[in-house]
Amino acid sequence: MAAILGRLGLVLHPDKTRIVCLTGGSEGFDFLGFHHRMVESSKHRGRFYLQKWPSQRAMASIRAKIRDHTARQLASRELKYVVQDLNPVLRGWGAYFRHGNSGRKFVIVDSYVHERLCRLAAVKHKERLRQWSKRFDYAWVTRLGVYRLTGTVRYWKPAHALR
């Protein structure tokens, strides 16, 4: 492999290059922000399919961005302006990761956004954080206009020449 790449003037990075056995679904690899792994079918035992979802690094990155946009220092701002700043971040991240098997990760990100906005509202209105689940439900988040990632996953469709 190194000889073929050498003729093309390419070199493999020894720290980043590793051989992964995908059979059996025991391990996977991260590439371009996605974690790729063979996953066994729930309907057909013994049949594996390659699936991809956002990697741990990608999840940590979006959590850090959400945390920055909902910091305690922003409690003096109106929530609609916080949401206006947060929505483009969520839209862009969701547009990149919506192709694949990202549904479960999208639910995690949505619940994290909900939690952070509730904490920010509780700090803003000087309420106890234990009471946030009663007052700040998902309907409240929807009324704020927060972009929801849940339900935005798109699956690849086969191309048809005559359609």
Where are these regions (language model features)?
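Non-catalytic terminal/accessory segments
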Residues: 1-163
